[in-house]
Regions:
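Short coil-to-beta strand junction motifs in C2/discoidin
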Residues: 321-327
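Short beta-strands and strand-coil junctions in structured, solvent-facing domains, enriched
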Residues: 86, 316-319, 503
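Extracellular hydrolytic enzyme modules, especially secreted metalloproteases
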Residues: 97-319
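Generic detector of solvent-exposed, compositionally biased contiguous segments
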Residues: 14-81, 163-167, 171, 243-297, ...
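Propeptide-to-catalytic entry region of secreted or membrane-anchored zinc metalloproteases
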Residues: 1-163, 171-184, 190, 213, ...
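Residue-level signal for secondary-structure boundary sites
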Residues: 100, 205, 318, 337, ...
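Residues within well-ordered beta-strands of beta-sheet-rich folds
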Residues: 91-93, 309-313, 330, 497
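Long beta-sheet-rich domains in secretory-pathway and surface-associated proteins
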Residues: 431-534
Length: 534
């Protein structure tokens, strides 16, 4: 019931709900039959200590080497017969914690050092070490380390909310896209909180350090949606849902402009689920110079990406616990593969971070009061990665890839009657000066009367991406733009507000000039002048 039936306990969120949202109703989990419980023939540690260099940490000196799946499947078969082939998947939930949710919380977060772990958290054999090694670091408490790690077989502890993540492995054969954030040299994460196949599987109330709660209603209970690349691989969206262009094509077509709807819902009429820009042309397709991850933690590793994607994240549906609304820009590979260098990892999504600087936030506080900061490799470094539209938005509205000769723009934001967000985005080739129809700026006539402060609305027509600037002539008058970019397209006119404010003692009249300069061809300039008066 917890996994499939919406209730007050699971806050209305189910495994089926997640997959139905991501797949637009194509894939779901509508039936789950429970068997057991069964008493395992061996203690928990006999299964949990068989991984991550823990095998020799058993209380009785034996070597841990057992798999829970074999024993539980045998008990199930003896009880009910051989039913395994009757089901698409077998989920084994054991009474205990999933080590992924407790190794840090009941290890280095709870104890200052491995030598300070008290007896109740230690190996029952006092002659054995108090600690055990674990997946990412050298030690955790024995009690935490004896737990099993969730696997795509599919195996989960009672605290684990990452069943959706493991199903991604099991049903669709998609690998992890995550780094090891705990070892040096540190390397930046791939997609972080923005995709369920990375640490977005940890999203939910309380975040990553609340994944020990039973039942799993806190961290990891609301995983992020899937990015464009993974939805394409799974067959959840098709090329028809996207606007797809290529680097070479942009060189001959001029800028491309499109509206993209938030990924948690169906694209609105006339809009797309995302934009794809393929890196085609002469080899190498990805022309990013190789950098050494050993000295540059922000390096994406081996230049091997096939295309850019742009999509919109809105904090609704299963994206509710994403940290921001905005445009998600990423590099993607068609095939999975490791990204090279020290601490390399399987990386097929590489989010472009609008704020690549250190986020400078505390991860946790040790028992002795010492603050532990999030490292450059922590997935939450990408919490502020999204691009926004307009000036003073708290983020960037454009991104230039000089090496791959592309310029991306976040041009405007829109909300419909249901408050669904969509963005107008654009892309152009840095090697093209083509403008399909030059932009023309038109000013309102006659002179406008302004009472202290107000708005002058100019009109833009044409088919191009342009950069705007505004100025005012008149004593004591100020002028501001909320957006530095505009992109009329498809014969549609765009209304551009220019905001004015008059100070006490200002001149009675002023002139406002709006200038639009083509991004592709800076020689194409249009301007218009409006008169205002008090």
């Amino acid at each position: 019931d917890f996994w499939l039936k919406p209730s007050a306990v699971n806050h209305g969120q189910t495994i089926n709900g997640y997959w139905m949202e991501q797949s637009r109703g194509k894939f779901g989990i509508t039936q789950l039959e429970a068997f057991g419980p069964y008493r395992m023939p061996r203690p928990l540690w006999a299964y949990g200590l068989n991984e991550h260099r823990q095998n020799n940490s058993t209380p009785d000196g034996s070597r841990a080497r057992y798999r829970m799946e074999r024993d539980i499947d045998s008990l199930w078969k003896n009880d009910k017969g051989d039913l395994k082939d009757n089901y698409d998947a077998t989920l084994r939930v054991y009474a205990g914690y999933d080590e992924t949710g407790v190794w840090q919380e009941f290890g280095e977060m709870k104890f200052n050092s491995r030598d300070e772990i008290p007896a109740e958290w230690c190996n029952p054999n006092p002659d054995m070490p108090r600690w055990v090694p674990t997946r990412y670091v050298d030690w955790t408490s024995w009690k935490a380390g004896q737990m099993m790690w969730g696997l795509s077989s599919i195996r989960q502890g009672e605290n684990s909310g990452t069943i959706t993540h493991e199903l991604g492995h099991f049903a669709f054969r998609i690998g992890d896209n995550n780094n090891n954030p705990y070892v040096q040299p540190y390397r930046r994460v791939g997609s972080g909180t923005w995709d369920m196949m990375d640490r977005g599987s940890f999203n939910g109330p309380g975040g990553p350090h609340m994944r020990w709660v039973v039942p799993p209603i806190a961290g990891a209970s609301m995983p992020a949606g899937l990015m464009i690349r993974n939805r394409l691989v799974n067959g959840f969206i098709t090329e028809n849902d996207l606007i797809t262009v290529s680097r070479e094509g942009l060189g001959s077509s001029g800028p491309v402009i499109a509206r993209i709807t938030a990924r948690a819902v169906e694209p609105l009429p006339g809009e797309y689920a995302g934009m794809v820009v393929r890196l085609d042309g002469a080899e190498p397709h990805d022309r990013t110079p190789a950098t050494d991850p050993a000295t540059d933690p922000l390096s994406p590793g081996t230049p091997r990406f096939n295309y850019y994607s742009l999509e919109v994240v809105q904090r609704i549906g299963y994206d509710s616990f994403c940290p921001d609304n905005g445009v998600l820009l990423a590099l993607n590979t068609d095939e999975e593969g490791r990204n090279g260098g020290p601490n390399q990892f399987n990386c097929f999504n590489w989010v472009i971070d609008a704020h690549p600087e250190d986020i400078n936030m505390v991860d946790y506080v040790k028992p002795n009061g010492e603050k532990v900061m999030r490292t450059v490799a922590d997935y939450r470094q990408l919490n502020d990665a999204l691009f926004h539209a307009g000036l003073n938005s708290g983020s960037e509205f454009e991104y230039t890839d000089v090496h791959n000769r592309l310029h991306f723009y976040v041009l405007d934001i829109h909300r419909n009657d249901q408050e669904i967000i969509s963005y107008t985005v654009g892309v152009r080739s840095l090697d093209s000066e083509i403008t399909r129809v030059p932009v023309i700026v038109t000013a309102p006539k006659p002179a406008l009367k302004i009472s202290g402060e107000g708005t002058v609305e100019f009109t833009l027509s044409g088919d191009d991406i342009c950069r705007l600037s505004a100025e005012v002539q008149g004593k004591g008058w100020e002028v501001k733009l909320f957006n530095e970019l505009a992109a009329p397209a498809d014969g549609k006119k765009v209304t551009l507000p220019v905001y004015l404010k008059a100070s006490p003692g200002c001149s009675k009249k002023a002139t406002v000039t709006l200038t639009a300069v083509s991004e592709s061809d800076p020689d194409k300039i249009s301007r218009a002048v409006a008169m205002v008066r008090l």
